[in-house]
């Protein structure tokens, strides 16, 4: 099911959608539907261009992040636990020193700062092993935190492979400890989907958003020029919008339990 859902999600990504429309237009052209084929090609090019510009990337991503601004560590309340969602590491490493960090590694550093500041007495690292991975992301995150000197009570949730499972399995762990109030650490764009899933587990959630990707300033490259970085942000935003829509339609924000294999 995980593989199927990820493959289906790929079709909404700008590049995948572009090539899908191009392939459909080629088929239509061979069937003498040239006018429709040309329209699809124009739509494909326009959509890819839009998503690769600052206009498109900001229009798609900013609404996801706007509700979860960066908050100074001192301004966040005390909680019973800090919950960190996986997504910032992979188990690939060229040097045999553990997982490699990726673009979402801010989750790890932000959680380390919160824990060091005493915002909660316990931290929960949530993330199982992805497709083709031999080590769970929770274990990789623990290794990275220990390497930078973060000690103390850290619990691991190693079964989850989706955001929904993050919430469910972490919720079970927290309920066993009698914990109800958490600081949730994940990327700002991910918060819209993650928070209601944890609330469905009966938890009081305070967002501790990080990894904001909407730039404060456009920079040297004009906003109308397409770049791969902007295309990447649009892709991330579409992933979250579609994920939120699917979870909402399936009732995941209201359902506390899932079927365990």
Name every feature range the model reports, one short phrase each.
Residues 1-27:
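Membrane-embedded alpha-helical segments of integral membrane proteins
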Residues 3-8, 56, 60-64, 238-245:
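Hydrophobic alpha-helical segments of integral membrane proteins
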Residues 12-17, 204, 231, 244:
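Alpha-helical transmembrane anchor segments
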Residues 29-37:
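Membrane-interface helix-boundary motifs at transmembrane edges
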Residues 39-54:
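Hydrophobic membrane-insertion alpha-helices, especially the h-region
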Residues 50-228, 234-235:
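A structural signal for short, hydrophobic/glycine-enriched beta-strand patches
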Residues 220-221, 232-261:
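Extracytoplasmic/luminal low-complexity segments enriched in Pro/Gly and acidic/polar residues
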